[in-house]
Amino acid sequence: MTIAVGRAPQRGWFDVLDDWLKRDRFVFVGWSGLLLFPTAYLALGGWFTGTTFVTSWYTHGIASSYLEGCNFLSAAVSTPADAMGHSLLLLWGPEAQGDFVRWCQLGGLWTFVALHGSFSLIGFMLRQFEIARLVGIRPYNALAFSGPVVVFLACFLIYPLGQHSWFFAPSFGVAAIFRFILFLQGFHNWTLNPFHMMGVAGILGGALLCGIHGATVQNTLFEDGAMSNTFKGFDPTQEEETYSMVTANRFWSQIFGIAFSNKRWLHFFMLFVPVMGMWTPSVGIVGLAVNLRAYDFVSQEVRAAEDPEFETFYTKNVLLNEGIRAWMSVADQPHENFVFPEEVMPRGNAL
C-alpha cells in the first residue's frame, strides 16, 4: 500500500470570495449583488429622504416633501435647477462644495437617485443572469427585465442628456411622472409617434395575453378531486401536468380558427409582445431627446408662419398641444419668466 502525503492545493482569495458570494443562503448575493445591493439601498434611501424632507422651491418653485404638506401623490425628488445643466452635482463638486443642505437645495438628490437607480436596475438584471446560469436554465428572465431597464435609462438619462439639462427629466414621484407625460405630449406630440403606438400595443397586448393565458389554464385544469378549491385538486410535487394543452388548443381553434400548437411558441409570444412594448417606446424617447420633428406639427407651424400659401389642418390635437405648451411653459419653467400676450394664446373655433 502506498500512502501519498502532500499539501492541499492553495486556494486564492478570488476562489474563496467566489465561493462565499455564490453560497446557498436565504438571500442570494452573488457577484451581481456587489452592484445591486449598495446601489439599490442608496437609491431607495435617497428617494425616501428627498420625498420626506427636501423642498423643490429652489429648483421648480414648488413644495415636494411630506414635511411641506405633500402626500404620496404629490411628493417627489425633483430634478435639479435648469442652470445646473448636465452636471453630475457631486456633493463635493463645485456647485455644493460639500454643503449637504445646499446640495439638496440644488437638486443633487435627483442625480444621486437616478445614477444609483440605473446601476441597481442593471445589477438586478445581472442577478437574473447569474442565478439562471447557476441553476442551469435559460436567461430569458434577464432578457425580459431589459425592458424596464431601457425604459428607465431612456427617460431618466438619455432624454435629459439630449435636452438642455437634467431639469427636463422626470422627477421621482407620482404626479411628477404625469407632468412628464403631459410635457411629452405638449412639446413632442408623443401619442402620434409610432413608437409610442407600438408601446401601447405591446403593453396592453401583453396584459391581454396574460389574462387569456391564465383563464385558459384555469379553464382546462384536470379535475383531480371533488374540492371546489382548485389548489386542493393537485399535488405540487406531482410529475404530470394539471391542465390539458390539447383541450386549450381545441377551444381557441374554435374561437379564432387558429391556436398555438405548443407551449414554446405560446410562451415566447408572451415574452416577446410586452418586452417589445417596452423597447419600442424607449427607441422613440431617444428620438424625442434629439428633438426629431417628424410627428409634432411644429415644423408645419413654422412653415405656415413663413409661407402664407402653406395650409395646415388646425385640429383639436394641435389645439390641445398648444394649450399644454402655453400652460406648462409658464407653470413648469418659472425661472424663464414667460409672459404670453393674449393674441398668441390658443383658442378653439367657438371662442
From Swiss-Prot:
Binding site for Fe cation: 213, 267
Gene Ontology biological process terms from the UniProt entry: photosynthetic electron transport in photosystem II
Positions in coiled-coil regions: none
Electron transport listed as a keyword: yes
Enzyme Commission code(s) on record: 1.10.3.9
GO molecular function: chlorophyll binding; electron transporter, transferring electrons within the cyclic electron transport pathway of photosynthesis activity; iron ion binding; oxygen evolving activity
Protein name: Photosystem II D2 protein
Topology of this chain in the membrane: Multi-pass membrane protein
Lineage, top ranks: Bacteria, Bacillati, Cyanobacteriota, Cyanophyceae, Synechococcales
Keyword line: Chlorophyll, Chromophore, Electron transport, Iron, Magnesium, Membrane, Metal-binding, Oxidoreductase, Photosynthesis, Photosystem II, Thylakoid, Transmembrane, Transmembrane helix, Transport
Further remarks about this protein from its record: 2 of the reaction center chlorophylls (ChlD1 and ChlD2) are entirely coordinated by water.
Protein's cellular compartments: Cellular thylakoid membrane
Protein residues bound to pheophytin a: 128, 141
Binding annotation for chlorophyll a PD2: 196
Sequence positions that bind a plastoquinone: 213, 260
Binding site for chlorophyll a ChlzD2: 116
Cofactor note: The D1/D2 heterodimer binds P680, chlorophylls that are the primary electron donor of PSII, and subsequent electron acceptors. It shares a non-heme iron and each subunit binds pheophytin, quinone, additional chlorophylls, carotenoids and lipids. There is also a Cl(-1) ion associated with D1 and D2, which is required for oxygen evolution. The PSII complex binds additional chlorophylls, carotenoids and specific lipids.
Residues passing through the membrane, by range: 39-59, 123-139, 151-164, 206-226, 277-293
Catalysed reaction, written as an equation: 2 a plastoquinone + 4 hnu + 2 H2O = 2 a plastoquinol + O2
PANTHER family, alphabetized: PHOTOSYSTEM II D2 PROTEIN, PHOTOSYSTEM II PROTEIN D1
A Pfam family hit: Photo_RC
Presence of the UniProt keyword Iron in the record: yes
Subunit structure: PSII is composed of 1 copy each of membrane proteins PsbA, PsbB, PsbC, PsbD, PsbE, PsbF, PsbH, PsbI, PsbJ, PsbK, PsbL, PsbM, PsbT, PsbX, PsbY, Psb30/Ycf12, peripheral proteins PsbO, CyanoQ (PsbQ), PsbU, PsbV and a large number of cofactors. It forms dimeric complexes.
